[in-house]
Amino acid sequence: MKSSYQKQLDELITSLSDKKPSLLLHACCAPCSSYVLEYLSEHFQITILYYNPNIYPQTEYERRLQELIDFLPKFEPAIKNKIQLIQTEYNPEEFYNAIDIKTNPELAFEPERGERCRRCYKFRMQKAYDYAKQNNFEYFCTTLSISPFKDAEKINILGNELQNLSESGP
């Protein structure tokens, strides 16, 4: 039976009452962030983590980051709480090592939503989870499942695996 992640989220939000817990949101770009921020900002203190070493070339990485930076002040009237942004250094070697491209060069030619993407989702989500845990965030999530180009089912499975790693959150 498929999970209703929207129902689970709604139940979580209802259980929060007036509390606004901290949430680390891994974001891939501004467009995918907009709905998530609008929906969740009323209920959480959100910090965005822009960690995307998979984006190539570096100019595209920087363009997406700049779009996110430019987007946040324009979007402020629609959000309920101030959003923080954490930027990471561009390091594509981390990505190549994580997906093991040297051992599996065929991954470079896989279509969207294939094994390379699954490894990429896992890598970035693990980094976000680790950051959230190290910095005492109460929750973490990603915008990746919002994108029509990504495999939401794989992303949700990976999210559940991370959730099961620790009973103490994030």
Question: PLM features: what roles do these ranges have?
Answer:
Residues 1-35, 43-170:
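Nucleotide-activated chemistry modules centered on ATP-dependent adenylation/adenylyltransferase
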Residues 40:
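Aromatic pocket-lining residues of Rossmann-like dinucleotide-binding sites
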